């Protein structure tokens, strides 16, 4: 997606993103075409390509926007409290419920995992590198611990989404915190 502060371009980008999501409610992502997105968004081909390179670029922009919400919540945490960490991810998923369900239905949840693998190491380096636990590990070990954590948490969240978020998040969170606190 082309980054811009131009209100007209931002409006077009938003219309394109909304059009893709509306179409995904009726059709599989893999079957959608840029032409259908153009028609649904009521914009010209030139406008689309001025803002995005492909439908995958549109999807990527939506995933990035959602993950930005998550990272902003993480950055607001004042300590390394697991409850608050889990609250942040559950809150973002709940507030974007229909988006995550569309991703799940279209086998695209892996896009979030890929984005987390980009965002979380940066946040770690900025805010958690002084944590006493991480000071005992090599840089390579830290990389693998972060990857392990992202994979574990994201698999839990993916399962929750695939089960239509029926299990109360408090139940999931309590089980995870109990497991993590006894596995030392």
Predicted segment positions?
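Short, hydrophobic secondary-structure boundary micro-motifs
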Residues: 32-33, 101-103, 112, 169
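Amphipathic alpha-helical segments that line or abut small-molecule/effector binding pockets
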Residues: 80-98, 147, 151
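An amphipathic alpha-helix adjacent to DNA-recognition modules
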Residues: 10-21, 30-34, 39-42, 49-79, ...
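N-terminal intrinsically disordered/low-complexity leader segments
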Residues: 1-9
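Amphipathic alpha-helical packing segments from all-alpha helical-bundle domains
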Residues: 109-134, 140-155
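Regular secondary-structure segments
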Residues: 17-25, 67, 71, 75, ...
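Cytosolic nucleotide-binding catalytic cores of signal-transduction proteins
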Residues: 2-3, 25-27, 136-137, 144, ...
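C-terminal peripheral helix-coil segments that are non-catalytic and often amphipathic
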Residues: 159-184
